């Protein structure tokens, strides 16, 4: 791996719904040999379970936190070394949101999902309607990250296209314990 691997030990990935945070975070964590923390799987935002799970997961040494740590900034940001902002254009976010909603609408039912649940993806967080409703707000919010008091001294990397993000990830080199091709 090129670069200072210890700099990339504790990372938060942010971006609008549909930017590809989960997929990118999983790839980055694998590349760095770090734990991938998928915020949306830690429980309802702000719940006791969510707060306890976030605190426990960021106590580790190497992790990639997928999504902004709402309600837990005071715990997550002081431990963070790098914030990666996937700042993609509105049309890409909309296209990805529509594709995701279509996959979830016409694809196989998820465990515990009823037929009526299929259409909630169009208006749910991460769906195209929600993504467009919060696009400008989230971009402004993430644009203020450099001034967040909990992130003083933290490196903020901002990628404007998926190709720039992929090139940066490729430049990190091979995942630990894997043969270089």
Enumerate the predicted regions with their spans.
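NTP-dependent small-molecule kinase module
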Residues: 2-6, 129-181
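The conserved Walker
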Residues: 17
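Conserved lysine of the Walker
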Residues: 21
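Hydrophobic positions on the alpha1 helix immediately C-terminal to the Walker A/P-loop
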Residues: 24
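A glycine- and Lys/Arg-enriched "phosphate-lid" helix/loop adjacent to the NTP-binding pocket
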Residues: 88-138, 172, 180
């Amino acid at each position: 791996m090129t670069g200072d691997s210890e700099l990339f030990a504790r990372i938060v990935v942010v971006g609008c719904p549909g930017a590809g945070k989960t997929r990118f975070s999983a790839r980055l964590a694998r590349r760095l040999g770090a734990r991938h923390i998928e915020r949306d799987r830690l429980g309802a935002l702000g719940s006791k379970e969510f707060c306890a799970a976030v605190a426990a997961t960021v106590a580790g040494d190497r992790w990639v936190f997928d999504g902004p740590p709402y309600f837990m900034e005071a715990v997550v940001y002081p431990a963070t070394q790098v914030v990666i902002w996937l700042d993609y254009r509105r049309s890409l976010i909309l296209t990805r949101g529509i594709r995701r909603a279509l996959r979830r609408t016409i694809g196989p039912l998820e465990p515990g999902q009823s037929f009526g649940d299929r259409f909630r993806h169009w208006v749910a967080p991460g769906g195209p309607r929600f993504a467009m409703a919060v696009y400008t707000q989230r971009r402004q919010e993430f644009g203020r990250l450099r001034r967040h008091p909990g992130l003083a001294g933290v490196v903020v990397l901002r990628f404007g296209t998926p190709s720039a993000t992929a090139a940066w990830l490729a430049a990190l080199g091979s995942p630990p314990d894997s043969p270089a091709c």
